[in-house]
Structure formats: structure tokens, C-alpha cells
Amino acid sequence: MSNILKFGIPKGSLEDATVDLFKQAGWQVGISSRSYFPTIDDEEMNCKLIRPQEMGKYVERGTIDVGIAGRDWVRENDSDVIEVCEMVYSKVSRRPVRWVLVVSQDSPVQKPEDLHGATISTELVGFTKRYFAERNIPVTVEFSWGATEAKVVDGLCDAIVEVTETGSTIRANNLRIVCDLMESVPVLIVNKAAWADPWKQAKIQQIATLLKSALAAEGMVGLKMNAPNSAVDAITEILPSLNNPTVSHLYNSDWVSIESILPEKEVRSIVPKLLKMGAEGIVEYPLNKII
């Protein structure tokens, strides 16, 4: 096979969620605990496990053609890559993560300017330095190897810049968020030379379309039913849909078939209403993709 796309799968917190996303999109990815080279049932692709913190530099160099990494790490490394699309998912939820400025609960700091001359600990050193430099706030930024929250509690620094999804760990450590510095989501990033290759660009666009369609189907289901003609207006009035419900006349009958796509959590409340309106044969089915 002459055409091979080198794809970087993020190792760590996004790893399992990424494998699940590929599965829903139509690819089977297998990861061994002893290998950094996942298998994939697509002979046009080779996969490598790479830390999101390093994904940008490897894509920029062309070591891999395309990969998934948080926008935060792409910005941290100032990587010169093409961002194809956002893919909002994480280890906990389907929402962005936030990099926040955090101090101890009893700190007098209320805004970034109050940290003049302070020491800040974070994994996101480059971004944090640029953030304060752009605002002409002199600070010392130190790299944290982990357990960052404990450092501000123990007085090893004046503040930290830390990532959070829910804020629960920050609150549990008796810390307080001063402000949000950046919101980040996973992004599909591509090497510029790879994007200029027609075959690779087409393959990347195929992958992007199917991954995004799998994300769009999260929490959505299909619902179909039969109903008398006389109930169509009332049913379609209450039935959620992507655009409008599909209504098809049944052969040699004064009944119709109605089909719609809606959030799964709404089914439990809408089915009793549909039954009262005369709907029958209601079927709910799962969705893998919405394109």
C-alpha cells in the first residue's frame, strides 16, 4: 500500500475515549499495554500513541501526518499546524476543559493583576508566561511535575494555573478559582505538507467527517411510529427533530409512518403523549452517526 496516513492517538486521559469514538465512527482500534503502536482495521492508516503534550511538535515535524490533541497543548507549544476541526469530548464529559488561575481560599488575590511579583506553578508554562507578559504583570512561572494543587496549599507558590472540567478537585482542596485563562477542546491537527497532499487531505476529511458524525450522535436516538392521518399535525407539533419529522403514507391505508431523531432523554416524557394521540408501534433505535 503506497498511500499510508500516519495518525497520532492521544495517550493518557483521552486514550479510551478516543478509541471509543473511532469505534462509533466505524474503525476498530486495538491498544496493547506493551505497545505504542495501536492496530486499526484500515490498511491505509498507521497509528501511534503519543502524549497530547507532544502531539503538536510531532505533527509539525511530519513525524506523523495528523493527530488529536487538546488545543491547550497546541497553543502551549506554539505548534505550526493546521487545525481541521474541533471534537468536543474528554475523559469525563462531552464539554470543554478550562485552564484556570487558582489561589488558596484565604488569599487576598481577586484578579490576575493582584499577582504582581508572585510565583505561579503550572504544567502550562509557555502559555502562562505569555498570558501575564501580554498584560505587563511580572510573575515567575515554574513548571510543575504534578500534584499542583498541593503546592499552593503548602505555600510553595502563590498561585497555580490548572486544568479542570468540573472544579470539584479544586474545591476539595480548599482552593478558589480567580478566573478562567483558556478553554480547550480536543482538535484534529494536520501537518501542512500532509494537508497539501490530495490523497492525504481526502483521507483526513473522511476521518474528520465520521468522527464528528459520531460525536453528533451522542445522546441521540431515532424514534418511529405509525399514526392515523388525523393525528399527524398534533404529533409533529410535539416531536423534536433535526429539521422536521419524516412522514410517509402507508400503502392502502389512512395511516402514516412518522420518524424523527431526538435526544434520548426526551423519549421518556414524549412516548406517553404519543400514545394518547393514537400513535402505535413505537420503536426507538440507537444511532452511531449523524452526518
Curated annotation (Swiss-Prot):
How the protein is activated or inhibited is described as: Feedback inhibited by histidine.
| Associated pathway | Amino-acid biosynthesis; L-histidine biosynthesis; L-histidine from 5-phospho-alpha-D-ribose 1-diphosphate: step 1/9
Which Pfam families does this UniProt record tie to the protein?
A: HisG (PF01634), HisG_C (PF08029)
CDD domains tied to this protein: PBP2_HisGL3 (cd13593)
Which function does this protein serve? Catalyzes the condensation of ATP and 5-phosphoribose 1-diphosphate to form N'-(5'-phosphoribosyl)-ATP (PR-ATP). Has a crucial role in the pathway because the rate of histidine biosynthesis seems to be controlled primarily by regulation of HisG enzymatic activity.
Name a GO CC annotation attached to this entry: cytoplasm
Question: What is the protein name stated in its UniProt record?
Answer: ATP phosphoribosyltransferase
What broad taxonomic lineage does this protein's source fall under?
Bacteria, Pseudomonadati, Thermodesulfobacteriota, Desulfuromonadia, Geobacterales
Query: What Enzyme Commission number(s) apply to this enzyme?
Result: 2.4.2.17
Q: Which UniProt keywords apply?
A: Amino-acid biosynthesis, ATP-binding, Cytoplasm, Glycosyltransferase, Histidine biosynthesis, Magnesium, Metal-binding, Nucleotide-binding, Transferase
Molecular-function GO terms, alphabetical: ATP binding; ATP phosphoribosyltransferase activity; magnesium ion binding
